[in-house]
UniProtKB/Swiss-Prot annotation:
Phosphoserine: modified positions: 37, 53, 89, 137, 139
UniProt entry tagged with the keyword Metal-binding: no
PANTHER family linked: EF-HAND AND COILED-COIL DOMAIN-CONTAINING FAMILY MEMBER, ELONGATION FACTOR 1-DELTA
Originating species: Drosophila melanogaster
GO CC annotations, alphabetized: cytosol; eukaryotic translation elongation factor 1 complex
Superkingdom classification of source: Eukaryota
InterPro entries per UniProt: eEF-1beta-like_sf, EF-1_beta_acid_region_euk, EF1B_bsu/dsu, EF1B_bsu/dsu_GNE, Transl_elong_EF1B/ribsomal_bS6, Transl_elong_EF1B_B/D_CS
Biological function: EF-1-beta and EF-1-delta stimulate the exchange of GDP bound to EF-1-alpha to GTP.
Protein's UniProt keywords contain ATP-binding: no
Family the UniProt entry places it in: Belongs to the EF-1-beta/EF-1-delta family.
UniProtKB keywords: Elongation factor, Phosphoprotein, Protein biosynthesis
UniProt feature, compositional bias: Basic and acidic residues: 114-125
CDD domains registered for this protein in UniProt: EF1B
Name of the protein: Probable elongation factor 1-delta
Amino acid sequence: MKVEALDKFWADKSRYDLAEKRFYEGPQKVTDRSHYSPLVSEIAKAREHIQNSLEKIDGVTLDDGLNSELAKRLAQLEGEHKELKTQVSLLNELLTATVKRLETQLKLTNGVSKEPEVEAKKPEANDDDDDVDLFGSDSEEEDGEAARIREERLAAYAAKKAKKVQIIAKSNIILDVKPWDDETDLKVMETEIRKITQDGLLWGASKFVPVAFGIQKLSISCVVEDDKVSIDWLTEEIEKLEDFVQSVDIAAFNKI
């Protein structure tokens, strides 16, 4: 009897009881933890929102406000496109007209031809006519007519050139003439200077200008023709008046 009782003894019962307890308590703990975890609820909301967004995109559902905004934008882009096409067309027309105008001007510039030179035809000598020039009288008349026309043109050109007014280059000069001392008579010195004459020289106004220590200088103006009177010659002529003149300076020089 004792041996049978020992054979029926379950030594691992406690381990099986613990496993059974864990099996039944596991789902309950997971359910309770979901109630108290905010992260799980946020994930569920995010999944729901993503699912709704995907359904809207698949169905191409847009709001009325968005549709009207897109329509306005498309209309604005179409208007700008038409305006750009119009401006490009106008620019092309303007460019074409400019090119045509330039081509016309180039043709006119390059198309100016000189007067054709009329060459008198010389009759060819015919050996069969024994060197008889049958058109000799006509050629002589043509040569005489050409010579007359040439003479008339030369005469007309000469007359036109003679009538043309030639521009004479002139200069207005102011000279400062300094005497030796205060005892020099400036009036006499001026008289002697004005005695210098030359074709193309015209004396002008004059005045006495104080220098220092009671000494004065003569400032006199004159107009000279550049082709006829040299400035160096004029100053040398004035300096030849050694009894009165110490030096001559050019105070002003202007072209007329």
